[in-house]
Amino acid sequence: MRELLQQTIPNLTGEACDKFVAYYELLVDWNTRMNLTAITEPEEVVKKHFADSLAALPYLAPGVRTVDVGTGAGFPSIPLLIMRPDLKLTLVDSLQKRVTFLEEVLKTLGLSAQCVHARAEEFGRDPRFRASFDAALSRAVASLPVLLELTVPLLKVGGKAICYKGDVSEELKTAKSALHLLHCTAEVVPVEADYGARSLVICTKNAPTPAAYPRKPGMPSKKPL
């Protein structure tokens, strides 16, 4: 596992390598009791979860206040935090069991982050969090219009929503309305990967989000913008 990590992730320190190994062990152990990931083979986890999560590293300035919406088993936030402990991260998930897992990971790895159990739609309306982040990450399996409605309201004006995607050429066409309504502009950054097309869609928030968004829980996915 260590050799695999060192071959795959550039500039990996011994301490960070230890943390990735511990994270993998926790992931596989907890996955026997709850559904965290279908990917459990070491090589697959290192490439498709750990290394893939790190694609956003160049776009996160030191110390930026960052939120990971629908973090699930901790991707991309935990790998990013292992490499960049300076990040001020908030991890949001709708399932309490996953939040408990994330808190255990952070404690075991000696990392600091805030974990919140909430639906993304409700979190985006909470005045403590709305329009308060510099960056919003999402690697969740949802269409771009849905991800934008759940992430953009959390950003300060000038902040960036970073969505992890595959081939987005068709999805970008369907996201035009969401980009317009949420006052965003999008840039697609290809990500090098040997397991299929990967990209980051980086959306910059250019004006405050209208009060109507995000809509009530379930609506963004039922009726995408």
Describe each region flagged by the PLM.
Residues 73-86, 149:
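Conserved SAM-binding loop of SAM-dependent methyltransferases across substrates and taxa
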Residues 20, 24, 50, 77, ...:
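A general structural signal for well-ordered alpha-helical segments in protein cores
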